[in-house]
Regions:
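Alpha/beta-hydrolase fold catalytic core
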Residues: 1-22, 44-46, 83, 164-168, ...
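Conserved HGGG/HGGXW glycine-rich cap/lid loop of the alpha/beta-hydrolase fold
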Residues: 7-60
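Active-site loop/oxyanion-hole signature of alpha/beta-hydrolase fold enzymes
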Residues: 37-40, 49-89, 93, 244
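Flexible "cap/lid" loop of the alpha/beta hydrolase fold
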Residues: 96-104, 109-138
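Conserved alpha/beta-hydrolase catalytic His-Asp/Glu region
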Residues: 122-125, 139-191
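Short beta-strand/loop motif that positions the catalytic acidic residue
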Residues: 192, 198-200, 204
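Conserved alpha/beta-hydrolase "acid-adjacent" motif
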Residues: 205-211
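Catalytic active-site module of serine/aspartate enzymes centered on a nucleophile-bearing elbow/loop
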Residues: 222-257
Length: 257
């Protein structure tokens, strides 16, 4: 199994395909295996690297750094694999590390996709207030109701079960996640001059599309994609649309043939 040593911990990754590199960073309810739709679709034309964050999937977190180590871990993976410049696709929790790394090392990121996330972004007071109020309304939902939209839950009970089964392999969950999130502002992200695509699921109850769109408008040079009939996990709920539109955007931004 492919591991990279990072201090006392080991970071697991899966790498398939040949071509321009795409790094996938999962959310708190996922791990490398959650990206199976993207791995199979994109490996025919790209090198796809799905990374387990420390404490998730097959990665350990001996130092118990949690989020505090995510950005350095990403740099460690890129260095170990000799990846000078990559496209990053990050969902939910993964977006925090991706955004912070992009601001810190913009020369290493050719395109950034922030899917179903505002994690790690300093929000204006009005948006922050609405997000805080929203969090109270979602407290009573089941985990599946939080991460998958009603369209998918009703139509795909087997795939919905698979989502939770994949998450069961994580040592860490949303309640036990340690560390401090490194935040950056939408202004700083825009000033990095890295192309950014914000992806929103139309049924996302955690990061509603209106709020994601509002933050996208504050991020200079960024683009916005909304995916219908998808909740907080658009990459999992509507993979065909996600794979096509996100890949086409990355290919355009990075001038892949």
């Amino acid at each position: 199994m492919p591991y990279i040593n990072q201090g006392a911990s080991r970071l697991y990754y899966e790498k398939q395909g040949d071509g321009p590199p795409i790094v996938l960073l999962h959310g708190v309810g996922g791990n490398h295996a959650s990206w199976f739709h993207q791995m199979v679709a994109w490996r025919e034309k790209a090198t796809v690297i799905a990374v387990d964050a420390r404490g998730f999937g097959n990665s350990s977190d001996v130092e118990e750094l949690g989020r505090s180590g995510f950005v350095d871990d990403l740099e460690c993976v890129l260095d170990a694999l000799s990846l000078a410049r990559v496209a990053i696709v990050a969902q939910s929790m993964g977006g925090g590390a991706a955004a912070a790394f992009t601001v810190r090392s913009p020369e290493r990121v050719g395109a950034l996709v922030l899917a179903d996330t505002l994690v790690g972004l300093d929000l204006p007071d009005d948006i922050a207030a609405r997000m805080k109020a929203l969090a109270k309304t979602t407290d009573g939902l089941t985990q599946l109701q939080r991460v998958l939209g009603p369209t998918f839950l009703n139509a795909q009970p087997v795939q919905s079960y698979l989502y939770t089964a994949l998450a069961s392999f994580n040592d860490t969950n949303v309640k036990t996640l340690r560390g401090v999130q490194q935040n950056v502002s939408p202004t700083a992200l825009g000033a990095s001059n890295v192309p950014v695509l914000f992806v929103a699921g139309a049924e996302d109850v955690l990061f509603p599309p209106d709020e994601i769109h509002a933050v996208q408008k504050l991020t200079a040079g960024s683009d916005y994609l909304e995916i219908a009939a998808a909740g907080h996990s658009a990459y999992f709920e509507q993979p065909a649309i996600f794979n096509r539109d996100v890949y086409d955007w990355m290919a355009h931004q990075m001038q892949w043939s």
